[in-house]
Amino acid sequence: GVILDSPDMQKRVKQLDYGVGFNGYFNAGVMLINNDEWRKNNVTQESLSMINCGKIFRYADQDVLNILLNGKVKYLQRKFNNKTTLSVNFDAEAKNIDNTIIMHYVTPNKPWYKIFKARYFDRYFNESPWKNNRRFFSPSPSEIRLKAKREMSGKNYSIGLYYYFCYLISKVFRLRF
């Protein structure tokens, strides 16, 4: 089972001419896989062969899976893959979360880094068996610097200085905290 990708992505992929029907391209970040069928059709090996054939696929493994599984998938409701993004420059999570089963953070910015505000993730993380596990502060020093700039431009000087200090420490001492 897969979830159709956004209309914008359908248009972009149509131009790539992969042979995937318009409005048939799915987001491969969340898939419900029938393991017996997957093995029977040798999907892992076929995917690796395509990825290593030398052709450049715009959306990498997602394109390959769409090509290989074209016409062989069942489409599920969007609530099983509600895509959202995170950034230090704005606070955003999925707007329509009613009935959401799986929230999928689609950028490299993931909610398990403390620098990103992700109220839904935080809520469920704090109720999970992993609530006492350490969460890293940021994926990179540059994200900390962006957060510092955002806070400073919002006139939150003490918070901005705190993040800038964290940025300097992580950059100079190559620390990850």
Annotate the PLM regions.
Residues G1-D17:
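Conserved donor-nucleotide/metal-binding helix-loop-beta segment in metal-dependent transferases, i.e.
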Residues Q15-G21, N89-D91:
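Short, P/G- and charge-enriched loop/turn segments at secondary-structure junctions
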Residues G19-V30, F57:
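A recurrent flexible, glycine/aromatic-enriched loop bordering the glycosyltransferase active site
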Residues A28, N35-F177:
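A glycosyltransferase accessory/donor-loop signature
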